[in-house]
C-alpha cells in the first residue's frame, strides 16, 4: 500500500523511466528488422517485459545487458510459430500491435492477457486486419481475447479509422509491412505517431500528411535506438509541481513528441509556468528538459481535439483541477472507459471519497476547483495511472491518502515512490 501526505512543494532535478510506447515499439520493430538493434533507456516495466517475452516465444534472441537491450532481428519473415499461447499480460499495446505483425505470418498464433486485458475491446483491430486478409477469431466474435490469428497473403488497403487510436493505426501499418500494395490509414484527429517515426528510422517507405499515413513496400534494418523519458510518467510530477506554489522542478531527458505534449498545453492554459530547455532530437523524436515553477492555477476546458495528445494524463489533470480556482470541464474522453479500468468512473468515485466535488459526464467529468481534499483510503482498480494520480492527490490532502493495490504502478513506473520521496519538501 502506497501512502502519500500533504507537502509544501516539489523541488529538484529528476529523470523518469523510458517511454513506454517507444520501448514497446523498439522491441517489436527491431525483431522484424534485419540485423542487430541496440536499445538504450528501455522501460523495464511489466508491460514492456511482456512484449519481450512474446517475441522471445516467436523465436527472437533478446538479451538484457542492463545498460541496453540487444535484439537479433530476423527480418519481416523470420518469426517462428510459437509453441505456447502468447501472454501480453496487462498490455493493450502488446496485444494490439503484435496482432498486426501476426496477421502477416503464415502460421497460427493464440494471444491472450490478464483478466483486465481480456475485457478490453479488440474488434477495433480485428475488423481492419480481417479486411486485409487475416483470419482472426476470439470471444465475442473476435472482440475479446484470447485471439486466434492465422495470417499471410495480406493486401494493403485504404482505411478510415473510426477511432483516433495509435494502437489501431499501428496494428494496420505493421500488417501493411506484409501486404501487397500500399496501406493507407486516415484519422480525423491525429494520434501518437511513434510507430511512423520508428518505421521511417528503420528504413520503411512511409509518409504522413495531414492525418493520412501511407506505407509502401519496405524492409527494416536494425539500428541503435535511444528511448527518451516518458512524458506520461513525468506528467504526475509536472502536474503536482505546477499546482504547488513555490515548487521548482526539472525533469530531464523527456520525450517531447508533439502528439504527446497536450499536458504541457493544458498546464499552461491553467496558468502554469513551464519552460523547455536543452531541446534536441534522437531517432526522429524530440527530447528536452522540462522546467516547472509552481503557482496558482485556474480551471479550464479540455475538449476532444486535444484528448488524443493527453489521454493518459487525464487522471492527474483531474486531481490538480480540484486544487485550481474555478471549474474544469473534460469532454470527448470516451476512450478512458476502455483503458486498464474505466478511468472516468474510477477517478470520479475515488475523488468523491476524498471530498472533491466532481460530476461524471458520459465522455468526461466536471470538477469544482478550490476544494479542501480530506484524505482517506482509495482504490487503484489495478490501474497504474489511477494509483499514481491518487498518490499526487495525497500531496494536497489534509490527511494521508492510502492507495490499495498500488503495486500496479510497476507496470509503467517501477521506482515511482522513491522518485517522489526525493523531490517532496
Swiss-Prot record:
Xref: CDD domains: EPSP_synthase
Active site feature: 312
Main location: cytoplasm
SUPFAM superfamilies: EPT/RTPC-like
Pfam families referenced in this protein's UniProt entry, alphabetically: EPSP_synthase
A single GO cellular-component term on record: cytoplasm
Residues where 3-phosphoshikimate binds: 20-21, 25, 165, 167, 312, 339
UniProt cross-references to Gene3D superfamilies, sorted A to Z: Enolpyruvate transferase domain (3.65.10.10)
Transmembrane intervals: none
Cell location: Cytoplasm
A biological process term (GO) from this entry: chorismate biosynthetic process
Subunit structure: Monomer.
Sequence similarity: Belongs to the EPSP synthase family.
HAMAP family named in the record: EPSP_synth (MF_00210)
Protein name, per record: 3-phosphoshikimate 1-carboxyvinyltransferase
Organism: Alkaliphilus metalliredigens (strain QYMF)
Gene designation per UniProt: aroA
Amino acid at each position: 500500500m502506497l501512502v502519500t501526505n500533504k507537502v509544501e512543494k516539489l523541488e529538484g532535478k529528476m529523470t523518469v523511466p523510458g517511454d513506454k510506447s517507444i520501448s514497446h515499439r523498439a522491441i517489436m520493430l527491431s525483431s522484424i528488422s534485419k540485423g542487430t538493434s541496440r536499445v538504450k533507456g528501455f522501460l523495464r516495466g511489466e508491460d514492456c517485459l511482456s512484449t519481450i517475452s512474446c517475441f522471445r516465444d516467436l523465436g527472437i534472441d533478446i538479451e538484457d545487458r542492463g545498460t541496453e537491450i540487444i535484439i537479433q532481428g530476423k527480418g519481416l519473415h523470420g518469426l517462428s510459430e510459437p509453441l505456447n499461447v502468447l501472454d501480453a499480460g496487462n498490455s493493450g499495446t502488446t496485444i494490439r500491435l503484435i496482432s498486426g505483425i501476426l496477421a502477416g505470418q503464415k502460421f497460427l498464433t493464440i494471444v491472450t492477457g490478464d483478466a483486465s486485458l481480456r475485457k478490453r475491446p479488440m474488434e477495433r483491430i480485428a475488423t481492419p486486419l480481417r479486411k486485409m486478409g487475416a483470419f482472426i477469431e476470439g470471444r465475442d466474435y473476435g472482440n475479446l481475447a484470447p485471439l486466434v490469428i492465422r495470417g499471410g497473403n495480406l493486401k494493403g488497403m485504404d482505411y478510415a479509422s473510426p477511432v483516433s487510436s495509435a494502437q489501431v493505426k499501428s496494428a494496420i501499418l505493421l500488417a501493411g509491412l506484409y501486404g501487397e500494395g500500399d496501406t493507407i490509414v486516415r484519422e480525423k484527429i491525429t494520434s501518437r505517431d511513434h510507430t511512423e517515426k520508428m518505421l521511417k528510422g528503420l528504413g520503411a517507405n512511409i509518409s504522413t500528411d495531414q492525418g493520412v499515413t501511407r506505407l509502401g513496400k519496405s524492409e527494416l534494418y536494425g539500428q541503435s535506438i535511444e528511448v527518451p523519458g516518458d512524458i506520461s510518467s513525468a506528467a504526475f510530477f509536472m502536474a503536482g509541481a505546477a499546482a504547488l506554489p513555490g515548487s521548482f522542478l526539472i525533469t530531464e531527458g523527456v520525450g517531447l513528441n508533439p502528439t504527446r505534449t497536450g499536458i504541457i498545453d493544458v498546464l499552461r492554459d491553467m496558468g502554469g509556468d513551464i519552460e523547455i530547455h536543452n531541446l534536441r532530437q534522437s531517432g526522429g523524436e524530440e527530447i528536452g528538459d522540462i522546467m516547472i515553477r509552481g503557482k496558482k492555477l485556474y480551471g479550464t476546458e479540455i475538449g476532444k481535439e486535444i484528448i488524443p495528445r493527453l489521454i493518459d494524463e487525464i487522471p492527474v489533470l483531474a486531481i490538480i483541477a480540484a486544487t485550481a480556482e474555478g471549474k474544469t470541464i473534460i469532454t470527448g474522453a470516451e476512450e478512458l472507459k476502455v483503458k486498464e479500468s474505466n478511468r472516468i468512473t474510477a477517478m470520479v468515485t475515488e475523488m468523491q471519497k476524498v471530498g472533491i466535488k466532481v460530476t461524471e459526464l458520459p465522455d468526461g467529468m466536471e470538477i469544482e476547483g478550490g476544494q479542501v481534499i480530506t484524505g482517506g483510503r482509495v482504490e487503484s482498480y489495478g490501474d497504474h495511472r489511477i494509483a499514481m494520480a491518487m498518490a499526487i492527490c495525497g500531496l494536497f490532502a489534509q490527511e494521508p491518502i492510502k492507495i490499495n493495490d498500488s503495486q500496479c504502478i510497476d507496470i509503467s513506473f517501477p521506482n515511482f515512490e522513491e522518485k517522489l520521496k526525493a523531490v517532496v519538501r
